[in-house]
Amino acid sequence: MKPFVGDHTIETILVDYTPHLIKRIGLFLLVLAAAIMMLTGCGGGGSSSSGGKETSAKPTSQLEKISSYVKATNGFNGHNVRFAFSIDKVLAKMKAGEDLDFASFPAYNSLKENLTKAKTESSGFSDIDESTTAVLKVLDEMVPLTSKMESYYTSKEYTTDGNQKGREMVASYLKLYDQFNTEYSKLDSAISQHNSELRDLLIEEMKKDNKVMAATYMEISRDMRRALEAIDPEDPAKTDKAQIEKLLGQVKENMEKLKPAEDVSGVKSFKSSAERAIGRIRTYLAGGGGNDAFNDMVEAYNDFIRDSNRIDASELDNKKK
């Protein structure tokens, strides 16, 4: 993934960890979090995933188990998107062998703290647990190093030694950076995969339980994410625009169907941000790609997910009193 200079660009600077566009989408897209945790009474349904631990637990209980991991990576990815410009700029200079006079990094420290807390209980999936351990191992070296680098440049110590110490730390950082990107991409992918699988199971259970509005709400988020994941940021020309338009059409169709019997907080904002995300996706595809359009698209998507997470799905099927 693209050099991580910068979550979620996600790309160059925004969300991914590769020197070019590659699959930064995976690392910078926020994941739908726990609004579903509020849902109760869903039927049981087992889930089993390659690389993960088999489980017969209900989707809701499994989603609850991984929710702390989702929040940890969402926070990290979101920070990278917001501060992508400065993070990417610094990373580009390091990779070009230029001396730095300023340091800006992803939020490694908070990621370490949040993953350490999450790890106190198993996620329920072996691949998530193993990847978390691997990421934390790299962060044990990354966090103190970046702290020293920030202090070194903030204090302007680099002016007293001709940046010699700075070059040494940059070399160490770039090695750790590659290791981190490798391990974090595995973790991010595992969390996203299991989260998606569990939500598909939950959608089916909700339909069986006649929770039509809650299922529709989840389908909107699912299809929006699938539309973005179908985009090839390295070569936009290879993107199947027809497939993406089909998914976006399903999103718009379901937004028309999402009409709770009672006013539910956040639904209007959710629909507005969905429309904005659809517009940014279409703009990106129509323009043939480009970093600015890509970052705008991912930012709009992440805003959509934030609004999604503000909805209490358990209220969507309440009947008027």
Give the location of each predicted region.
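A cross-kingdom marker for long, charged
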Residues: K246-K321
